[in-house]
Amino acid sequence: DSANSCYQRDKNHPAILIWSCGNESFGGKTIYEMSQLFRQLDKHRLVHYEGVFSDRSYNDTSDMESQMYTPAAGIEKFLAEHPEKPFICCEYTHAMGNSCGAMHKYTELTDREPRYQGGFIWDYIDQSIYKKDRYGKWFLTYGGDFGDRPTDGDFSGNGICSVSYTHLTLPTSDQV
């Protein structure tokens, strides 16, 4: 069982604040049972699951409302209509290309709405890999650059920070 394995591996790790029942798996009884197992094993940490909005019959799966890419105005509206839980964006922007606009709307919402817990950016670090070309010069690679069948192409070439951690790559990086 993945929830028990996750718990046993990480139960004493001080950085674990919230247990997660997964990502983008929709809702349902199995995910709900995972949340119950986390609560049974650990009565002190919260449980998170993003897919509750797709199946409200298991609304108690997550201790907070969690959605992806909901506009700041939509979050504010949801909280006004549903005061019973705080709200967290498990993804609210995707740091790829010329993205991460309107981040200020989310930080402003944090100042206005105490039940808005903030959110997470996908991706923080560029996932490209360094490789030497035939002349010995290093370059960044991604899907298909190793003679393999390309997967998602340059989809991994993203992130707020460069793969070398030497600089921020997006104009909105200072807002993070």
Regions picked out by a protein language model, each given a short descriptive name:
Residues 1-168, 173-174:
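Extended substrate-binding grooves/exosites of carbohydrate-active enzymes
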